[in-house]
Amino acid sequence: MTDSNFTIGFIGLGLIGGSIAKGIRRVFPNYTLIGMDENPDTIKSALEDGIIDSIATDCKTDFAECNYVFLCAPVQYNVMYLKDLKGSINENCILTDVGSVKEEIHLKIEELGMEEYFIGGHPMVGSEKAGFSFSSDRLVENAYYFITPTKKVSEQRVKDFKTLLKN
């Protein structure tokens, strides 16, 4: 997993998304990280800090080459982004989220026929603070990280995702 052609997309770079992105940047500095966030200050900071390499502006095109896409926005927004990602992510992409509740996103994944790509996730971390400025490259380190793969996602994808999380 040290391939410099490896690309990871993030939709939402708040406390959790920002922390995961910062951790991946620290461990895998050669990976390409693409970020999208509704807050222009957040996305500007992530780019200026070298956490992301480019800013995504369109879910339908900007995540097409990603090996992973992390949905790190609030749950109701993550569900909305799925429609845009359907048909645009590549066949090898692993799609995941970090939301604390799973029923709504799993139902939408099933409805859209995206089950072979999706592994739900939730790192058991948090802070009384919120936002990218409070994210840390070590926030999710050594934390419990629950995963909820669909029944149709392959064992290899689950194994690959667990490997990324362990690093």
Features from the language model and the residues they span:
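NAD(P)+-binding Rossmann beta1-loop-alpha1 motif at the extreme N-terminus of oxidoreductases
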Residues: 1-58, 63-64, 68
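Rossmann-like NAD(P)(H) cofactor-binding subdomain of soluble oxidoreductases
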Residues: 83-133
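Short secondary-structure boundary/capping segments
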Residues: 1, 60, 87, 110-111, ...
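Hydrophobic/aromatic beta-strand patches that form the interior of the parallel beta-sheet core
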Residues: 34-36, 56, 96, 119, ...
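Internal alpha-helical scaffold of NAD(P)-dependent oxidoreductase catalytic cores
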Residues: 139-167
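Rossmann-like NAD(P)-binding element
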Residues: 60-89, 93-94
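Glycine-rich, N-terminal phosphate-binding loop of Rossmann-like dinucleotide-binding domains
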Residues: 72-74, 99, 149
